[in-house]
Amino acid sequence: MSLLTEVETYVLSIIPSGPLKAEIAQKLEDVFAGKNTDLEALMEWLKTRPILSPLTKGILGFVFTLTVPSERGLQRRRFVQNALNGNGDPNNMDRAVKLYKKLKREITFHGAKEVALSYSTGALASCMGLIYNRMGTVTTEVAFGLVCATCEQIADSQHRSHRQMATITNPLIRHENRMVLASTTAKAMEQMAGSSEQAAEAMEVANQARQMVQAMRTIGTHPNSSAGLRDNLLENLQAYQKRMGVQMQRFK
């Protein structure tokens, strides 16, 4: 795996699934391929994206700044600086300085990532902030190692919370989770339908699922009534895809 492929993998792992993730993936590909060279426009686009947490925006802003060639005097962006200040915690800043000194001695991506993984997410963010604000310099490879270590920690905590959701036994939470997943699956079906001949059929199935979820939420239903709702929807989606000659692996 090349360095940039690895960076793209780690960064995308912390972004919630949806149309925005696909858009960000495209931006990263363009940036890494040298196709997008307007850093200012890129940062303006990033700043106004919905859904993303400030820290995720900070990490993406840091990656764009590292990768896109820019004029020397280009202003640093406040939204990135605020996201990478370690919540203003002086302990994070102290640890970030210690980490920075260690990173100065590293020359490889993997070496930097290994060193960085033993620090907290707050310290890692602060260390990125130091480099972003030009208070310290490391090689691009080392900076990418720092980015990937931060993403790995964030992805780990997200994975833990997903696992907790999967093992929750509270029927009300499970019921609501099934309905939310059914809604997002319906949305995906509508987006994939496009303008094909069978699009109307896919839209109809998605629409019925939405109406069912809406009705269940409006009148209130027994928590078990949503069981199988998302699975039925997925079966419909996969049958539709087979006819379209599209195979969507691991949608579940």
Swiss-Prot record:
Record motif Nuclear localization signal, residues: 101-105
Gene3D superfamilies in alphabetical order: 1.10.10.180, 1.20.91.10
Protein name per UniProt: Matrix protein 1
Topological type in the membrane: Peripheral membrane protein
Positions of region (RNP-binding): 165-252
Subunit structure: Homodimer and homomultimer. Interacts with NEP. Binds ribonucleocapsid by both interacting with genomic RNA and NP protein. May interact with HA and NA. Cannot bind NP without genomic RNA.
Keyword flag RNA-binding: yes
